[in-house]
Amino acid sequence: MNTRRGFIAGSALAALTACGRSNKKVIGVIPKATSHMFFVSVHAGVDQAAKDLKVDVLWNGPQNETDFARQIEIVDSMIAQQVSAIAISATDERALVAPLERAIKSGIPVTIFDSGVNIDDYVSFIATGNFEAGCTAARTLAGFLNGATDVAMVMQKPGGTSTVLREQGFEQTIAKEFPQLKIVARQYCMADAARSRTVAEDILAAHPNLGGIFASSEAASLGSIQAIRGRNLSGKVKLVTFDFSKTHVEALRDGTVSAMMVQDPFHLGYEAVHSLYRTLNGETPPKRQDLPARVILKADLDKPEIQNLVQPKWLDETH
């Protein structure tokens, strides 16, 4: 992705130079992590909005979404640079409260996207309906299982609102609607794909009769795919994943993944910038925007509307 990295660096430098100047609008966008495919897709939406709306964007975030200290530093840096507005996907719903309140008190409007923060004075909160998506994931996994069986959850990390809500939705739906299913393991991968493989392998070893796994994030999914393949359990242990990458799609095609829950991160990034653009121009965007997640099965993969989600044209252009 060298072409894209060059563009990112150039646009960030241009935006940085513009900060503090006259009436030039610079919107700072802070993802949870720059290393995940999900946020690469968010970035593409951010860039498209910047082009369409003729604003500059300063994109900066921690490499890993467990690094809330780095995200706090970035917020404070953007305050010091006097950006016009900030959009953020918070690594932790509590740790980011004070820095974002500092931004708001300094006159910088803030939009929250993907993962919430415990503040009230934000412009807009834009996210997938994560609790509902978790409920849907539970129903989807249950549909692949026959009779009473054990299931497990490979989870992201504590404190990340988006994934916590998915996990709560999954767990509550299993308990209420599928009493024949028992959740025998709930383990965090701490947003690390390598660690998620170890977690999933440990679960599979401890529960040889496991019927299914729900992996609540991109990292959790990638490790779970590897663990199931490594034990030759593709198709035997049903796996419902969240988010997408080339690995997810290949695993759905070969039967390792039974279903993918897919968001629309491009739209998420676009709307985050758009909400702040509207605010900076005296408009009032919706306080909350919920974007749906979709269930994708193997039979759906070649449908044009699904291809636009899992293999968007912009991705081909940047590889």
Regions found by a protein language model. Give the residues of each.
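Extracytoplasmic "Venus flytrap"
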Residues: 28-45, 49, 53, 58-73, ...
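Hydrophobic alpha-helical
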Residues: 79, 87-104, 170, 189-251
